[in-house]
Amino acid sequence: MSVTSIMDDLKRRMDGAISAFKHELSGLRTGRASASLLEPLTVEAYGSVVPIKQVANISVLEPRMLSVSVWDKTMVGAVERAIRDCGFGLNPIVDGMNLRIPLPELNEERRKELVKIAHQYAEQARVAIRHVRRDGMDNLKKLEKEGEISQDEARSLSEKVQKLTDDAIADIDKILIMKETEIMQV
């Protein structure tokens, strides 16, 4: 394994951890309507369970109102049930093949709960990044032991790995602060 491939792999895996963190955060409900809120939902359709995006189009009508346009009239009931049962306390209003979903205000207690969950997601992402860092350091030590790189090169590369790690964790912290601000905004 070459030094370049090790560094590229580290960067790719750290970026993957950040992307996964962003994806987890997108599922957290804030006070503002977002189509990504309903994306994780699944609907029982045509004898199997499919993502809601495969049977309907989700859009934002107003800051506190989502619209779900179901493509097949027979699926309206199943989509409505999935939204009602998702655990977000949403009550869709059926209007033909469209569902309007007003988002209720979040109370202070629920906002703090969501911030706590966001912090847990952030910590999981930081741990994932530290695991990637450890793997990179282990690979560098192995290359040094095998004589493919000198001790000085290993030290220099270790510092680069540490910088990559610090940058990735700083990105996570920045994303977390933005999400926290969004959640706590009344």
UniProtKB/Swiss-Prot annotation:
GO molecular function, one term: ribosomal large subunit binding
Localization (cell): Cytoplasm
InterPro entries with a match to the protein in the record: Ribosome_recyc_fac, Ribosome_recyc_fac_dom, RRF_sf
Pfam families: RRF (PF01765)
Highest taxon above the source species: Bacteria
Stored Gene3D superfamilies: 3.30.1360.40, Ribosome-recycling factor
Keyword field: Cytoplasm, Protein biosynthesis
Any one GO CC term of the record: cytosol
GO biological process, one term: cytoplasmic translational termination
Family under the similarity heading: Belongs to the RRF family.
Known function: Responsible for the release of ribosomes from messenger RNA at the termination of protein biosynthesis. May increase the efficiency of translation by recycling ribosomes from one round of translation to another.
PANTHER family: MITOCHONDRIAL RIBOSOME RECYCLING FACTOR PSEUDO 1, RIBOSOME RECYCLING FACTOR
Protein name: Ribosome-recycling factor
Native species: Bartonella bacilliformis (strain ATCC 35685 / KC583 / Herrer 020/F12,63)
